[in-house]
Amino acid sequence: MTKEKISVTVDAAVLAAIDADARAAGLNRSEMIEQALRNEHLRVALRDYTAKTVPALDIDAYAQRVYQANRAAGS
C-alpha cells in the first residue's frame, strides 16, 4: 500500500497517550495513528450503513413475531 505523508497538530497529552498505547500494542506512533484513523473510518461507515439498512429490515417487528411464535409454541 502506498503511504502518504501528512502533518497534523496534536495536543501533547493526546500524543503522550498515543505513544503509550502504541508501545503497549507493539506499534510505532505512525502505525497507531493510522490504525486509529482506519478504525474511525470503519466506525463511521458502519454507523451510516446501519442507519440506512436497520430501519428497512424492521428488526423490531421481526423480533416481536419470533417472540409471539415462541410463546404460542409454548417455548
UniProtKB/Swiss-Prot annotation:
Keywords: Toxin-antitoxin system. It comes from the Bacteria. GO terms for biological process: positive regulation of growth; regulation of DNA-templated transcription. This is Antitoxin Rv0298. Disulfide bonds: none annotated. Antitoxin component of a type II toxin-antitoxin (TA) system. Upon expression in M.smegmatis neutralizes the effect of cognate toxin Rv0299.
